[in-house]
Amino acid sequence: MLDVQSIRKDFPILDHKIYDKPLIYFDNGATTQKPRCVVEKIESGYYNVNANIHRGVHFLSQAATEAHEDARKTVQQFLNARSSNEIIFTRGTTEAINLIASSFTDECMSAGDEVIVSVMEHHSNIVPWQIQAARKGITLKVIPMNEKGELCMDTFRSLFSERTKLVSVTHVSNVLGTINPVKEIIEEAHNHEVPVLIDGAQAVPHLKVDVHDLDAEFYVFSGHKIYGPTGIGVLYGKEEWLDKLPPYQGGGEMIASVSFEKTTFNELPFKFEAGTPDYIGSTALAEALRYVGRLGMDNIAAYEDELLRYATDKLNAIDGMRIFGQAAHKGAVLSFLVGNIHHYDMGMLLDRLGIAVRTGHHCAQPLMQDLGIEGTVRASFSFYNTKEEIDAFAAGIERVRKMF
């Protein structure tokens, strides 16, 4: 059981007023607000242990290095990875997917080979593969969905061929909220000896993720989606796979030795971390993971599911309401349209009431094309949101509806 009113005190921004209205922040799918402890960790890092990490012999450098590597261990424990060598720090989910798209394609794919994605992917899990398709001639196959917004698993099983080299799918849809059956997807792929990449950007903040249990070869997420700072993300990869893949970028830290004749690369995880790492971001991310860990991921999931069901009932009572995504298993996301009101107009007018939602295609244009629409209004909830806020949200939608 979460003490939501106590939790809200950890997030000073929630006390803000927008246009003289209390802020109702329902844009958590885009980014989450940051608890005071995370902001204080960033401040403390710059004030007390700011130094470039690794190889420094002085005290500050060694202290910063220790904090950074401790953060890596925190991520390892949070995901239940086998080794901290399997945790690569990136700038976010997008860079992590691009890293795998580049390195995996170079090492494991040739013209005519196939990657399976789904119709509900974020652009970050489409465009990197299209770049590789243009560069190397690989092919994308797409898993369709049914009218509820669930992946068509029978069709998925039929997509495999001897040229299929990777499955790359989202754990939770950022538009529909659909929680995909990723364990079943992984098992099916492994039946064909095909590795799997899971985009966990929308899953990690809301669900308990155990990469050892899932058994995916790669799993990626962003810090700012789980109450950490922007500019830091994570690539989890099975050690045997990361060992065989070539580096994504060249530069400092990812090398063992350099001469004009030859460069040898560093060991894991440093082989994939060229340049000065975001050691302040990594420690702040670790602080965010500790924070949600204290709340308990099971508690978070249960409360957010309660919010989702409450909000769904409230919105369904509004005339002209169309909610997109009716999957049996959903995360705390509602995408909708009301009558003929443009999503942008709805979002702008809700903003005047202090309500922050996301409007547009949500970086999922192929999904919008599949739905036959240009965009939606998206409300995405967090454990610091309340039913009272949902009541005000529903009243705000009704107020806007009556204006048109």
Task: List PLM regions with ranges.
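Pyridoxal 5′-phosphate
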Residues: 1-404
